[in-house]
Amino acid sequence: MKKVLALVVAAAMGLSSAAFAAETATPAKTAAPAKTTQTTQHHKKQHKKTVEQKAQAAKKHQKKGGKAPAKTTSKPTTQPAA
């Protein structure tokens, strides 16, 4: 753990000294930064297709099984004459 801490401290010291050296090595006069032209992009609005609500409601309330159930025909039961 101590070795890791020592490496971190050494790296920080090395970076700070490198930054200090680079800062002092630059000439006193600095050139003005070049102008950058900024272009703005205009995005067109996309019109979404309107969805009919009626169609969705009709789907919800639609009966399942499109055909009516077939009626079963059975012979009427006759009671024997008493």
Curated annotation (Swiss-Prot):
Biased composition (Low complexity): 22-40, 67-82
Region listing for Disordered, in residue ranges: 22-82
Post-translational modification: Proteolytic processing gives rise to the active protein.
Protein purpose: Required for growth and/or survival at acidic conditions.
Record's subcellular location: Periplasm
Pfam families: Asr (PF06392)
Name of this chain's protein: Acid shock protein
Annotated gene: asr
Record InterPro entries: Acid_shock
Signal among keywords: yes
Signal peptide: 1-21
One GO CC term, this protein: periplasmic space
Lineage: Bacteria, Pseudomonadati, Pseudomonadota, Gammaproteobacteria, Enterobacterales
Family: Belongs to the Asr family.
Basic residues bias spans: 57-66
Pro-peptide positions on chain: 22-56
Keywords assigned by UniProt, alphabetized: Periplasm, Signal
The organism of origin for this protein: Salmonella typhimurium (strain LT2 / SGSC1412 / ATCC 700720)
